[in-house]
Amino acid sequence: KKRGIDFNATTGLDRTNYFASFPANADTLEWVLKMEADRMVNSNVARKDLDSEMTVVRNELEAGENNPAGVLFQRIRSTAFLWHNYGNTTIGARSDVEGVPIDKLQAFYRQWYQPDNATLVIAGRIDSADVLARVARHFGPLKKPARVLPRFYTTEPAQDGEREVTVRRVGNLRLVAAAYHTPALAHPDSAPLSVLANVLGHTPGGRLHKALVEAKLAAAAGANGESMRDPGLLTAIAVVPNDGDAAKAEAELLKQVEQLATRPITQH
C-alpha cells in the first residue's frame, strides 16, 4: 500500500493469474518484479495463512452459491461435462475448501507455480529494452524445476443425446438456458463462434434480444461463447419475467439458436 500497488488475482478453468496495478515508476516496477520472482519459488504456504484467509474464501463460496445465474451455469457445466474437469467449479466444493490439508496446497504450489509454467505480462508506459533487462535479471536465475508437468489427456466423449437439468431454489428469478458443445480455442471455428455468440446475444441488436425481449417473452437475453484450451460451451440464456411463460421463452430461445442453420448470418 505504501508503494501505491493494487494486488489482485483471478482463477479460471484454464489458469490462475496474479497481477499488480501501479503508477508507471521504474523503482516500483523493479520492486514488483523482484517480489514476483521471489514468490514464484520461495513462497511460504503456511497453515496460519490458510486459516486467516478462510473467511474470504467462504465469502466467495457463499457469493457463488447465492448467484442464481452462476448456479444454473454450473449445473449446466456439470451436466455437459461428465468426464472432463470443466464440469467442476474452480473454487471447489465447500467440504474440500474447508478440509484441504496444508501439505496438499504446498505440493500444488511446488508442482504448478513455477517459471516454466508461467507467462509474464507487463503493460503500460514502459521502455521495452529496460523492462526486458529487469526481467532477465530477476527471473533469469530461477532454475527450471526437475519435475515434469503431467499431460492432461481426458477428452469429453461425444454427447449421445439431449441432456436437461432443472434447478429449483427459493426466490422469484426464473432463467432458461441452452448450451452447445464447441471446439477448443485453437480450432479454426473458435473465432467465428465468438462472432456467432455476439450475433445472438448482443443488446439491443442481437437475435435473442429481438425475439425474446422485444416480444416480452424475457426481461433480458444473451449468449456467451467460451475460448478455452479444450472444447467448451456456447450458452444462450433468457431471464423470464415473473408473469411470463418460461416454456414459451425456452421454445423461442431454442428456435433462435437452431434456426441459424436455415437463417444464416448476414452482413447487416
Task: Set out the residue ranges of the language-model regions.
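PPIase-associated folding chaperone regions across multiple families
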Residues: 188-195, 213
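Histidine-acidic residue clusters that define the catalytic metal-binding segment
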Residues: 18, 34-35, 60, 78-118, ...
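Non-catalytic, conformational "gating/processing" segments within enzyme and secreted inhibitor domains
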Residues: 54, 69, 104-138
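Short amphipathic alpha-helical coupling segments at ligand-binding clamshell hinges
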Residues: 192, 196, 249-252
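Acidic/histidine-enriched alpha-helical segments
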Residues: 1, 44-62, 127, 146-162, ...
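An aromatic/glycine/proline-enriched structural segment found at the starts
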Residues: 82, 86, 90, 119-184
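M16 family metallopeptidases and their MPP-like homologs
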Residues: 1-38, 69-95, 117-123, 172-184, ...
